[in-house]
Amino acid sequence: MLGSTSCSKDDDDDNNNQNNNNVVVNPTDEDDIKETAKYNFFGAELYSNETFTYGKFEAKMKMAYAPGCISSMFLYYNDSYKGNGEVWNEIDIEVIGKEPNGFQSNIITGKLEKKVTSEKIHKIDSPVADNFHIYTVEWTPDYVAWFLDGKEIRRSDASNDTKKQVAALVKPQSLRFNIWSSASTEWVGTLYQKNIPITQEIDYIKVYDYDTETGTFTEKWTDEFDSFDSKRWGRGNWTMENVLERPKNVVVEDGILKLKLTKELK
């Protein structure tokens, strides 16, 4: 059930232009630092091989929660990271370690060298990791909207978007899900090794096309994860701050796709 922050319209907030992901802060617990030195840490990312320009994206998930951990669903322009003038396009749903009773929505535009963001935290009445919820993003030329269990939580309209972020979402984006650990303890908290392994579970993913003439969505496909479809999905194999995202941490078990945050002795 939704808490008091059930739905919000976007407004201009200069504090939302901060990019917290690049702050490197070491864990403050001495025993945790010692244990960290013994291990390598591994995360996971699932990404669609297909890209989309507008649409509706729905997933039934049990998001992961632990201090220091990020569990996410997001749309992402695949060349955003390149810099050198390339635009950044991204739409996020993230459960962050310091906010167990809610999730963060965000649009990221601008460029690698100067990102524009609009983070908002949305509270619910119980920890998101306790149950499966249906998370949905609608992306059109006129608005971006976020939903939880069918209820609209936030909407950013192009008509009153002072940062012009909706209009800046011009690139085709892949659909992605990941679990990782940020170097910024200020943003997500400290990852304590006793909490690992941590798992994000996905029951199904559903994608809809958007018709710009009629303003309607039409179901395109649903994946219920009876198996892993390598034609539809790829597995991440790269570093995300404190972890290496590796393919073997994306698995399908009993009709559930699982993204795992794990550790191994060096």
Listing of model-derived features with the role each one plays in the protein:
Residues G3-S6:
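C-terminal motif of bacterial Sec signal peptides marking the signal peptidase cleavage site
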